[in-house]
Amino acid sequence: TDAFFEDMKKAVKQGVRQLTHLCNAMNGIHHRDIGAVGSLFFLPELKGELIADGIHVNREMLQLIYNNTGSDRIILITDAMRAKGLQPGNYELGGQPVIVTEDRAQLESGSLAGSILKMDAGARLMLSLEGVKIEDIIKMASVNPAKQIGVYDRKGSITVGKDADLLLVDDALHIKKTFCRGFIAYEEE
């Protein structure tokens, strides 16, 4: 989006509540107009999706966003394409050829084409930022998305009666086991 701050204020009045892929394919913060990105800092109704891979949004901008919104208004996402977890090489996204390297997916033009980010890697990057705690990661990766899409009554936290979708991770946030509705869906070998 190229929305200006005034446009974002109007959009919020019309019901907009989320910025998709914050900082990507949108105007940046400028000293004459803070645009869509800056609107997250001033409009408490908004939440922002972040692709925390250090490529779509660099560490300094991730830190700036966290410092100005806290974990309550950030939703961690991956925007991962189907080549996530596969070897570097040539793939396709929406009929377009995509080149996947060790850390990114891009079109021949060099434009980013989704990501190959795994959520645990994004969580580790966020946790490495100043002031971010494990409780913040849980909120940004689980609680906030579940609330935003209206499924918090059964997803997003560990409570009696919920679906028992759980991750078992080590101290470095590497996934060891995944449970879906109480059943083991993945277990590290």
Which residues make up each language-model segment?
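Anionic group-transfer/hydrolysis microenvironments
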Residues: 23, 81, 172
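Short amphipathic alpha-helices and their capping/turn segments at secondary-structure boundaries
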Residues: 6-13, 63-72
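Glycine-rich beta-to-alpha transition loops that act as phosphate-gripper elements at the mouths
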Residues: 1-2, 53-56
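His/Asp/Glu-enriched, well-ordered alpha-helical/loop segment
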Residues: 32-50, 54, 66-78, 83-168
